[in-house]
Amino acid sequence: FFADADIPFEVESDGRLSRFQARQRKLSIHCGDYFKFRAEPFDAVYDRAALVAVPPGLRPAYARHTQSLLKAHAAHMLITLEYDQSRANGPPYAVLTDEVKAYWPGLRRVGELGALSNMPPKFRDAGLGAFIEAVWLGAPD
């Protein structure tokens, strides 16, 4: 990311996680086991493809850990996928409205994109007729 964006950076590692830190900007990327990641609470979170990559059984732990990393009224943007899981399964996994609301009741759905053109080949091959990206915004409760 940093090299592609031509942003000077440094790398630090504590043996568990690697931290890529921009030299002249307040921007860092942490790589490693998400459940071992600890930091001061963040003002915001943007989840473009993490929740949909987590198997259903781990999602409650993912949501709790994410919440533990946020300030009380942190801004939250989440993008989920919706499709017929009886025809194809993830990853990326479908995450439906009831599940999002169970984890973060304060989020509201603000838009969606019927992204058939962006559908991964395995879903297209399964004959899915709908593949929706849903956009959620808000502050977690």
What does each model-found stretch correspond to?
Residues 51-54, 90:
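Flexible, glycine/proline-enriched loop segments at strand-loop-helix junctions
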